[in-house]
């Protein structure tokens, strides 16, 4: 007889070899879907597509040798009475066959591995090549110590060993040849390197300047006003990359300073292991109870019945242990949700102005609501994936001890097949669900745009257009949803088929053993109960994997937002701005949103303390940009801005912005009361201070005319108030803030002439003793300014007082003055 069928020690070594192989393949699958390489100068595949075919055929050949081995054993066992090889041999053959089938499927899966020999050999170097080398040693030992075959059965076994040895040596030779050729070939030639560099430069230019991406014009409303994304697809990430991304947020999930919550987490983990123990004791107790009942004893086994009921009462997520764990986990989950949600909002608010200019509010808000999904992801990994793996592992060990290694093999193969099918189908479903989620976000964003711009929609009578646009987005979402639901039902059918087939084999084998006296009826009950009990974690694994994928998809956008970095950041240990006088100096300041189109060029001026500086000029000339860079929404490209000889880039953003009061051209208010909106400038202000600020802004009497007075709600973005009322509320906020520097961006542009005079007087009082920079559309409002800067195409073309500029013949300011004067005279005439 050949050595392998008489030597359990060699079979044990085979199991060790098999473990190395399975562990390596598992590591490979964990890291799959990574890019083949990020090196732009990587060598080309010198073998082309041929090594893929050679490797695949080699793996198939190895698998077929084990098929021949198993078939040979079965035929010999049927021919020879009362003969069967040792169990370890059967298990080794089946597991090795399963191993090489997994390798073959993974190699053939284009998504699991790159499609070139270079990447295949790199990816499998740690998993398959080690198995090749070890297998060569084992096969050599088997062949050397095998006796001379005396019959066909032994000859076939020996031939299989020789075939595997030849295939392993052949595969190793291919790899060594590949390695030698790889090191002798030259890198990419100069032209290829140059083209690669140019391509990388273009890609970097696009990524750094998103505005260079062209807008696509389409008749479809789904592309209305959208940019084509050039970012990396989330599906290109591996599981390791996903866990690495999530790990950056784990500190916010762990209650670092709350020891009571930490103790509750410890109790939850203890309950988790207690639940696993009960999962063993419950079916075992049912088997014991069945054994006693089948003995036809006149004594009722009360203790066994009560013990079984207790186990059932404790078992499962609906049992006492599961319910207690869920109850104790509630405050931990709420802590994590609050930490993630507040962290997300804080991060978005800390992002620079350019992010908020390019964002879609609906999409960002949707992403921020997914903080619970991130919390769910962490909870699933710790308290759901762990228990499932423990239950399956404990079941295999228990079956091996209680019954037979064949039952362990059944559970193992069932688990592998079930998990593999679940992962593959779910991976296919993931892309469909990702499209569904993205289409839902798009429909939500369209709906949000229509509601947020309600007045514009009504002004242009665009109700039908918006309904059609939203309906088109909903149709796309429903189409993707149908695909997701179909794939879900298909997955359920396949999972049910795998479990039912495995259960049938286990029941038949157990029935055989009970029939011939190897096991008792109680053992059959234990097996059947435990197998049915295993269906729950297996089914739950499918649901869990889908839920895990869903959580990942739902939080992808949130993680992308967390990965966004502000372009304007404080220097480490930056001091607070100390405003003593309020002197503002712009020194050779240049700035551009897009490097191809400068907005400001060599801006120089000094705003003396207590003086009013007026900025006038054509729209788009850069006036508002001056205010933005003074508030440091953007950093200047060159030059510097100082306040009292302190560069604003060297101080904290909070101290800078708290020293500046702003009255914007288009004031936006929170959907709250008037009192809240005015008090927003100074949360510690008393009602008397608020009333005084409102009186100074000429809005107090108007507020008192509202039904609810200061408690009147202003509506979304202040739509319940007129433009003049909103502007006066903004002025009241600036007055209440009492800043050292005032920025007025056409603050009276939305007011009538009478109110403008009143507000102008209030603004003059506000600016008294403070540095004020005013953007003026109506030149009549800045005639008393201490310095007027006339800006055109990002440059200061004229400076002076009103009297000085009005006397300059051909000057830009004089032209604007007379144009407005003539327009006003013409309007009064008509």
Curated annotation (Swiss-Prot):
Q: SUPFAM superfamilies annotated for this entry?
A: ABC transporter transmembrane region (SSF90123), P-loop containing nucleoside triphosphate hydrolases (SSF52540)
Under Pfam families, the record lists: ABC_membrane, ABC_tran
Q: Which UniProt keywords apply?
A: ATP-binding, Cadmium resistance, Glycoprotein, Membrane, Nucleotide-binding, Signal, Transmembrane, Transmembrane helix, Transport, Vacuole
Binding of ATP, residues:
593, 617-628
Q: Which InterPro entries does its entry note?
A: AAA+_ATPase, ABC1_TM_dom, ABC1_TM_sf, ABC_transporter-like_ATP-bd, ABC_transporter-like_CS, P-loop_NTPase, Type_1_exporter
- GO BP field: cadmium ion import into vacuole; cellular detoxification of cadmium ion; glutathione transmembrane import into vacuole; phytochelatin 2 import into vacuole; phytochelatin import into vacuole; transmembrane transport
Name all ABC transporter domain ranges.
584-818
Which sites does the entry annotate for glycosylation? Answer: 150, 350
In this chain the ABC transmembrane type-1 domain maps to: 265-550
Primary location recorded for the protein, binned into one broad class: membrane
The keyword DNA damage belongs to this UniProt entry's keyword annotation: no
**Location within or outside the cell:** Vacuole membrane
One GO cellular component term noted in the UniProt record for this chain: vacuolar membrane
- Signal peptide per UniProt: 1-27
- Which regions span the lipid bilayer? 51-71, 88-108, 126-146, 156-176, 263-283, 304-324, 381-401, 403-423, 490-511
Q: How does it sit in the membrane?
A: Multi-pass membrane protein
Molecular function GO labels? ABC-type phytochelatin transporter activity; ATP binding; ATP hydrolysis activity; ATPase-coupled transmembrane transporter activity
- Using the chain's own numbering, where are the disulfide bonds? none
Task: Spell out the PANTHER family in the cross-references.
Answer: ATP-BINDING CASSETTE SUB-FAMILY B, HEAVY METAL TOLERANCE PROTEIN
Q: Report the family membership.
A: Belongs to the ABC transporter superfamily. ABCB family. Heavy Metal importer (TC 3.A.1.210) subfamily.
What role does this protein play? Involved in metal tolerance. Probably involved in the transport of metal-bound phytochelatins. Compartmentalizes cadmium within vacuoles, thereby protecting cells from cadmium toxicity.
Q: What is this protein called?
A: Heavy metal tolerance protein
Originating species: Schizosaccharomyces pombe (strain 972 / ATCC 24843)
Quick one: which gene encodes this?
hmt1
